[in-house]
């Protein structure tokens, strides 16, 4: 199933190669990764960009755990983008999973190295066009703008609008009925039964959103949710 997200795709396209870090934010499971790794990547390929010019790193994959370390992430990207005469598109998914590590030169927690330091350094290279996705309590809009010191462009993605869901259905009355009941989380529209859809939303709310809200407000830790 292909879900068109033309409104957000255009926003990304308009910011292509603008010398700034593109930060795609939004609640979990709203379609950020699909927008970047599917729709935008397909757009770039259709415009003549070669596959080896797109460097994709998903930090939620077990094979990429080492790149949650900012130093390893920096090394990996530099290794993959040695040709300074070629434009590279850097896609990093779930950037909030990156961890702060000690600065080997300064013994102070206030000087810990984070993904922000890495990205701000990489953006100075004129042949890199950087895009990241981030969700949960660590990536609120106010935090993003503060962390990137006005060197990033935020693209905030919402769940599917009714217009986007409408295009998925031949039976337009059914489209309205389903959207009215289940809302706009994209994965819902790949599930067949009402039971599956209801359970998915219940799990998403309990296991994901409640955790983020509580952690953001320092109420309880993960183990007690």
Where do the language-model regions lie?
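Pre-Walker A adenine-sensing motif
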Residues: 2-19
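Hydrophobic anchor at the beta1->P-loop junction of P-loop NTPases
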Residues: 24
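P-loop (Walker A) phosphate-binding loop of NTP-binding proteins
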Residues: 27
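Conserved lysine of the Walker
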Residues: 32-33
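Short glycine-rich substrate-engagement loop in P-loop NTPases that contacts/grips substrate
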Residues: 55-86
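Conserved Walker B catalytic segment
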Residues: 91, 96-131
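Short regulatory helix/loop adjacent to the ATP-binding pocket of P-loop NTPases
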Residues: 137-153, 169-170
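Interdomain hinge/linker elements that couple catalytic modules in large macromolecular machines
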Residues: 156-224
């Amino acid at each position: 199933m292909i879900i068109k997200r033309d409104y957000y795709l255009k926003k990304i396209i308009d910011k292509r190669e603008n010398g700034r870090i593109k930060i795609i934010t939004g609640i979990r499971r709203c379609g950020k990764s699909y927008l970047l790794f599917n729709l935008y990547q397909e757009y770039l390929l259709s415009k003549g960009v070669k596959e080896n010019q797109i460097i994709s790193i998903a930090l939620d994959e077990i094979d990429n755990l080492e790149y949650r370390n900012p130093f390893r992430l920096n090394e990996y990207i530099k290794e993959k983008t040695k040709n300074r005469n070629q434009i590279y598109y850097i896609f990093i998914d779930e950037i909030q999973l990156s961890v702060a590590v000690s600065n080997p030169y300064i013994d102070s927690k206030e000087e810990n190295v984070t993904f922000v330091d890495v990205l701000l350094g990489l953006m100075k290279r004129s042949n890199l066009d950087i895009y990241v996705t981030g969700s949960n309590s660590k990536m609120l809009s106010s935090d993003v703008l503060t962390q990137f010191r006005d060197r990033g462009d935020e693209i905030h993605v919402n769940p599917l609008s009714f217009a986007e869901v409408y295009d998925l259905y031949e039976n337009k009355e059914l489209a309205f009925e389903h959207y009215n009941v289940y809302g706009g989380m994209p994965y819902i529209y790949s599930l067949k039964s009402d039971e599956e859809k209801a359970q998915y939303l219940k799990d998403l709310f309990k296991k994901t959103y409640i955790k983020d809200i509580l952690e953001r407000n320092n109420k309880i830790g993960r183990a007690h949710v």
